[in-house]
Amino acid sequence: MRTHYCGNLNKSLAGQTVELCGWVNRRRDLGGLIFIDMRDREGIVQVVVDPDMKDVFEVASQLRNEFCIKFTGEVRVRPDSQVNKDMATGEVELLATGLEIINRSAALPLDFNQTNSEEQRLKYRYIDLRRPEMSDRIKLRARASSFVRRFLDENLFLDIETPVLTKATPEGARDYLVPSRVHKGSFYALPQSPQLFKQLLMMSGFDRYYQIVKCFRDEDLRADRQPEFTQIDIETSFMTSQEVRNVTERLVHDMWKELLDVELGQFPVMPFSEAMRRFGSDKPDLRNPLELVDVADLVKDVDFKVFSGPANDEKGRVAVIRVPGGASLSRKQIDEYGNFVGIYGAKGLAWMKVNDRAAGFEGVQSPVAKFLNEEVVNAILERTQAETGDIILFGADKAGIVSEAMGALRLKLGTDLELTDTSAWAPLWVVDFPMFEEDGEGNLHAMHHPFTSPLGVSAEELQANPAVANSDAYDMVINGYEVGGGSVRIHNAEMQTAVFGILGIEAKEQQEKFGFLLEALKYGTPPHAGLAFGLDRLAMLLCGTENIRDVIAFPKTTAAACLLTDAPSLANPASLEELAIAVKLAEKKDA
């Protein structure tokens, strides 16, 4: 039906007759002529309809926004005075010789010239996606997927599919379950990742695997999460963690160069402990210059239990953030930051303004200064390298609360005070994660997943002191977002059984849930390691947006609903009966 895309017309086509298909972006009647801005996925071009072409002019006079149309015409170069530098096709226009209305459009539920609610945009997503801004994002995501496949193919990785209907395994989030009609009362689980199958592929001899695959997690949603998401899944045999990081870093480095013409440089490597100590996060945004500074040793003897209590508690932490120029913050602003850290469990936010650094103790203003002697204040000023006009903000509590609260405050201050360099790219690797973490009841859980190999210890050593063991795991972080995570996997049954035992999975349960894996580990399993990227997050960063829904064609809401199709919905009673399922609906409470 067409010979060219609208957005691809240029001066090299001058004098040629072309056929275009697309939509009316805008119509203008000017000086007896009709001007149509015609749009398709590649861009917009101006079409001129002359009244001398009576049949075409008559049809063009009926056009309204979003009519689906076909134009035939001659490409001509615009006079210099009429060149539109804001359009990629602004040097040319199409002089129409033929016009067909393929389909008319009803009045639009969205207005392209103003901001529409996200609810409306998701309900009429097929219209929202026509907007050049959205179309460009989806196209860039497609280019990213194409680049990944090409890069991995060239590096001898094999694209192998794994099952979607599989067995439920504990991977951190709730599973989406699918009832079996044949095996009544039994359920499949949709995969949270292809983790075990890709490990089995390594055992099968396919030493370099990848897959761009849909995964499913029934978890609470945030702006950068969806119940179904796309993963770039990678697994290798006979590669060390460093070698896996090398090839996947090169993938991202080359992707940024090809798609954005951005040179990322070599990624720095940071241990988990350093990331938590300096930034209060295992995914630090290095574009933000603010850091957490520990001062527990300086305040452990002060007569102020808010500080001395956590300072003398082995599970406590006292940390500060020095904010350059922050002494200008009002008391109201400081109180608002105090309320903010309260979201993360902090009981308050002590502060100290440095009005005159040269005056030392006499030059600070703080409601807690009276509890701190001159020596302590001067030591804090020295350690934080404070200067006149700065403010020092204090966090004191359990280490986990301080790290999370002050880490979040660091990010908020970076945004509010425009300290974060939003024009920069700051990738890094975070490594040497703890193997396990404690829940509130003293039980151990795998920090990544239970198939991650410990770093440099035997099964016996791990069992003797699991709480201090590190894992051979690594996360790739870009601008404060974890875009990929991976690890070396356990490749012998003894170690895997030991890890299951530490996690409280008894022998019987191990066989029920993971018997196939433990059996497979007996037959010459190679050492293997891998990584999975979140394609949605990578695309989000590439497109310069902060909402993952902006780079997914048909996303769900934060309530895991599809406003376009009204999913999820009630099932047909006959289908439920065939599956031997009875649904118990929550009773509605009287108002």
Curated annotation (Swiss-Prot):
ATP binds at residues 217-219, 226, 482, 534-537. Its main location: cytoplasm. It is an enzyme of class 6 (ligase). Pfam families: GAD, tRNA-synt_2, tRNA_anti-codon. One of its GO terms (biological process) is aspartyl-tRNA aminoacylation. InterPro entries: Aa-tRNA-synt_II, aa-tRNA-synth_II, aa-tRNA-synth_II/BPL/LPL, Asp-tRNA-ligase_1, Asp-tRNA-ligase_1_N, Asp/Asn-tRNA-synth_IIb, AspRS_core, GAD-like_sf. One of its GO terms (molecular function) is ATP binding. It is found in: Cytoplasm. This is Aspartate--tRNA ligase.
